Amino acid sequence: MYIGLISDTHGLFDNELCKFLEPVEQIWHAGDFGNEHTLDEIAAFKPLIGVYGNCDDWDVREKVPLYQSFNSGGMKVLMTHIGGFPGRYDYNAFKLIEEIKPDIFVCGHSHILRVMNDKKRNIMVLNPGAAGVMGFHTVRTALRFKI
């Protein structure tokens, strides 16, 4: 399956992002949609798996959970918004990682694109950075990959 991974859209789902995501079969969103309208736009564009972020309001939180664990292409995936990275995981994310033992851990929040291997736990850690324009970052980022 061809996946488009985004996070931290903060209310922006524009033509540039649509063009980038056009070839994918499914979109994963690691939180901070920005509002319910943006979540609905993305879900209408492609099948969506998402979680809410710390900036999302109750309308978004009623539609997507704090974290999701699911299988894709034979891989166990864990997604939450605030996650950290190997050696510096958020405490709640670390508890979920230890409990679920995913093959792939997806998070957002930092607005920093990272693809890392947690060698200790044999987990691929993916943070797509920020696809929106709100925040300190100067470049919008997202990921596409095949499982």
Give the label of every model feature segment.
Residues 92-99, 113:
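Non-DNA-binding regulatory cores of transcription-related proteins
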Residues 68, 114-117, 141-146:
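Short beta-strand scaffold segments in enzyme catalytic cores
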Residues 21-23, 98-101:
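Glycine-rich phosphate-binding loop signature in dinucleotide/nucleotide-binding domains
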Residues 72-73, 100-101, 126-147:
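Binuclear metal-dependent phosphoesterase catalytic core
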Residues 11-15, 34-38, 55-60, 84-89, ...:
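Active-site environment of divalent metal-dependent phosphoester hydrolases
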Residues 6, 51, 81, 104-106, ...:
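Acidic/histidine-enriched, beta-strand-rich ligand/metal-binding domains
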Residues 42-45, 97-100, 120:
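Short, conserved loop/helix-junction motifs that constitute active-site signature segments
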Residues 1-48, 56-74, 79, 138-141:
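N-terminal active-site segment of His-dependent metallophosphoesterases
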